Structure formats: structure tokens, C-alpha cells
Amino acid sequence: MKSFATTVLLVTPGIYAAALSGRQGQAINSSCKVIPGDTAWPSRQIWSQLNDTLDGRLIQSTPQAAVCRPGGYGSISENGTECTTLKEDWDYAKAFLDSAVEIMNPWYQNTSCSPFYRVDQPCTLGNYVSYAIPVSGPEDVVTAINFTQTHNVRLVIKNTGHDYLGKSTGTGGLSLWTHNLQSKQIVNYTSPAYSGPAIKVGAGVTGGEALLHASQFGYRLVSGDCSTVGYAGGYSSGGGHSLLNSVHGMAADNVLEWEVVTADGRHLVASATQNSDLYWALSGGGAGNLAVVLSMTAKVHPDGLVGAATLSFNATSSPSNTSYISAINAWWTFLPTLIDAGASPSFNIYTNNFLIYNTTAPGKSAQDMSTLYAPYLSTLSSLSIPYTFQTYTAPSFLQHYNATDGPLPYGPYVASQLFNSRMIPRSLSSSPSNLTTAILSSVATDAPGIWQLGCLGINVNSTRISHPDNAVAPHWRTAMAVCLEFSLYDWAIPEEEMVARRQHLADVIHPAIVKVTPGSGAYLNEADPLVYPVGEDGWKDAFYGANYERLRGLKREWDPERVFYAYTAPGSEEWVSDAEGRLCRV
């Protein structure tokens, strides 16, 4: 893949002038963060002084898709060959991971410098940050906090750019880019709360990188299906679902301590025994809102055999659509049997197809999987539904992971998606018919786009998973699955059509699933801001449940000056973005 690296440079007059085009000298409300063109926006000299403080490491935003735009942008020139290569790679995380400013969500990339839309127009920053600091240690964080507080500039924290709620970018922002914090170490951790093997990783380490490192020492760890997600970033802090949840709990349940810099510039450790309220909040309450994470220490677990299974059937081969619906209902009823046995099935439901593309069962064999699935396969046979079922035994979790979510380091998953999440309460297993009806109608073939419900079966109930007191939303503890209402983003389709599909998700698909899952919630890292606008209250219960008010109180305590902001984080309702992207106090 062609590398499109962001350039380390000082502010140049040409770029500065482009940023101000049409808006120079604009006065704003003092309650708003400044953006380029405002009278209070820091001068070139001030940015140059910041660059000197950082020994020349300040990065000026240069969108990589500038190669597709007339005139390019900054140090990047228009280049048709490089544009073609970039478009081929655009759907995959590897195109974004080494950029200080790029994000993977199509909505927050906006169309200001897209390689697909409005390519006849000049490249502008739009929602991208203006500058970034490649964090090398706590001093860089303190420098950024002081600068943004002094000059009223928005502060942003970015790790890998896996961000579907826009928390890691923002118009006119100065970004703390934690990608270069790449340390990895297996340690013998000792504390009153836990003694045993653990891994300490820098904030820039991805889940796949952490897993590879742990496996060299005979361990596995709780990381995400997508290997390029930051292990110590929003993933673990947001809860973190995994193929290993039903055995080892949520990612946040495994965190032992956080090394952070707080809003007032203190460099400290938060654990179950020191700064325990901050530890509680960071472990499940979301990232980017209370402190900047430099490193995380988490449990690792002895590796071993992993039983696996796949299963598929479809409505076309079923005796009738009624039989297919009965099979889906029976699946929901059977699911608790699997997850109670420590298995986590990854499955997709379509209008006419059902697919379990992976079942992860640590400590089990292929024969165990056949035995475990036997009751459900018997149900399919009684319904005269033909199916394809396969099992295997992997000698280690790493080999199983590579076979299902690999190959590492990048894996198979695309970055450009439309989705929103919902947890399926275990209580529905006894009467799932309304759930099945809602799912099949939501993913119907006459809906705009190709939709599916993609789910992971889990059991992280506190009665079977030992975990520290943390801010993981209570909805997780009573769920039997976390699901995505999901469709791929199609860049070949006109922009207006993709906007309409997104609106369909917000107006039709998600409300239908919510209606049949009352009292449940959503994964705070996998949601669409159109579904959860910050000006409404639905996200508070969906993402945090009963923990919200305590988290809001800790925001006031640990960040009284509101140094940090993250969309739909506790306290974020105090802010709103205006029409030009300024972040303003309500």
C-alpha cells in the first residue's frame, strides 16, 4: 500500500491563508472555542512557538485525500496515480493508522477532502483538527493542555481513529495523537486486588499487537474482533466486547491500572487501590473525558485449546418461511446454553440467511462443540431445515483469532460502515418472537441498502464473571448478545443515497429493535450520532445506565475547567457545535 504520511512542519503563509479563506477576522461568542478565521485564533507566530516547545514535532493537518483534489493541500500535490491507490485502500484501517489526523468514520471525514465526493472542489479541512502533537510522554500532554487553555483552542485525543461518534477529531482542534506510545511488557503484577501475570502497553498499541506480544509468552487477552482498534484507548475504557467475554469478562473488567495525565496536568496512576474513583470511571465509562491515557495494565490469561464451530442455513432451503422464523426463534432460546458454557458465537441474521461464522469456546475441543450444539441441530432437523455445521480445535487462541478475525496485523474488517448497536437482554430468550419479527422486518430486502444484524453472544453477568467495581454499563451484565444493525458504506453510490440510508437506520431500523428490547442499552463505542444526538437524553441511559450521574459527578471533580470534551461522554451536553464547527458552551 502506498503510504500517505502526515507532514511535520511549521505553519506556512499559503496554508494559513487557505484556512482563513472567506472568514478572516470573524469575532465569536466568548463561550466558544476558536477556529481558524476567528479574531482570537492563535497567530502563526504562536503556533511556531508551540512547535519550538515541541522541538519541531508539531504536525499540521494535511488530509491524505488531497492527492485527489485540484491544487492538493499543503505539502501534498494532486496526483492521479496516488489518488487511485488511496481509493483502493480507503475502506481499510491500514490507510489511516499512521496518520495523525485521519479518522475512519465517513460522517466525520465529511466531504471537505474526500477521494470520492466533490473531487472537483479544492481540499479543505472541514471537521479535521488543525494540528496534532505526537505524544511521547506526559510533558507533551501538559504542553497541549496549557496551550489550549491559554488560547481557547479545542483539545482532542486521538489514538487509531476507530471512532464512530467523532470523539477523536473536531474543527480547529489541537490533537494529542497517542499512536507512538508503543511499549509492550509482560509483568508480574502484585496488588491487594490481583496478583498474577499482566501486560502493560502504551496507549498506541492495538489489540492485535497486544495479542501477538502476549502469545509469545503463552498468554491470551481480551481484545476486540477488529485487531487494529487501540487496546488501551476507547476500546477498554468503553467496556470492550471480545470473543473471550464469556470466559474472561469485558476488556474493562481486566484492566488493573491506568497511567494518565489529568486535566490539571498531574501524571498519576489510577487503580482499584489508588485514585480508585478515576479508575472506576475509566474502566467502562468511556475515553477522552477525564484524563489522557498514556498506558494501561491489564490481566492476561494462560492460553490453550479453543473449540470452534460454524453453522449456516437459509430460508430458501427451508420448507417455508415459517420454518425459517421458527429456527431463528429457537436460536435465541438456545443461545443462553452456549454462553453459559463459556462460548461466544459470532452470528449474522439476514432476511433469508442465518450464519454463525465463528464460535469461540476456550478450553473445549471440536467434539465438545458438536455436543454443545447438538440440541439446536436437532431442532433444525425437526424443522426439516438443511444446514451446514463444522467444528475444529485450535491449539491456541492466537491461531483461532487469525483464522476468524485475521490475518494479523490488519484483519478483514472494513472501516467505512453504517451501524448502530443494541444489546439483546437475556430475558427475551424465553419469548423471542417479537424480537425475531423486528429483526427480519428491519433487514428486509426492500429496505434501502443491504442490512443485517451482526451479533456476538456473551455472558458477562456478575454472578459468573469476577470483576472489579467499574463503570461498565449494567446493560452488559444482563445481555445475551450485543448486536449491530449494520450495512457497508458504498462509495460508488451517490452521497445523497448514503445519507438516506443512514437516516433509514436512525428512523426505522434502530427504533424497531429498541421497541422490542425495552430497558436495554447500546455499546458506547459503536453508535451513530444521528441515532443519539447529544442534545437529547437517550444516549445517557443507553451508554451508561445507572452509572451516568456518578460519572457526571466525577467529570465535575476531575475536570472542573472542562479541558476535555468527547461527544456523548458524561457532561458533553454542556456543549454544542455551531454551524461552522465551533464547540460552544450551552
Curated annotation (Swiss-Prot):
Coiled coil: none annotated. Pathway: Mycotoxin biosynthesis. Its EC number is 1.-.-.-. Glycans are attached at N29, N51, N79, N110, N146, N188, N314, N321, N358, N402, N434, N461. It is an enzyme of class 1 (oxidoreductase). InterPro entries: BBE, FAD-bd_PCMH, FAD-bd_PCMH-like_sf, FAD-bd_PCMH_sub2, FAD-linked_Oxidoreductases_BP, Oxid_FAD_bind_N. Residues 1-17 form the signal peptide. One of its GO terms (molecular function) is oxidoreductase activity. Belongs to the oxygen-dependent FAD-linked oxidoreductase family. This is FAD-linked oxidoreductase orf1. The lineage of its organism: Eukaryota, Fungi, Dikarya, Ascomycota, Pezizomycotina.
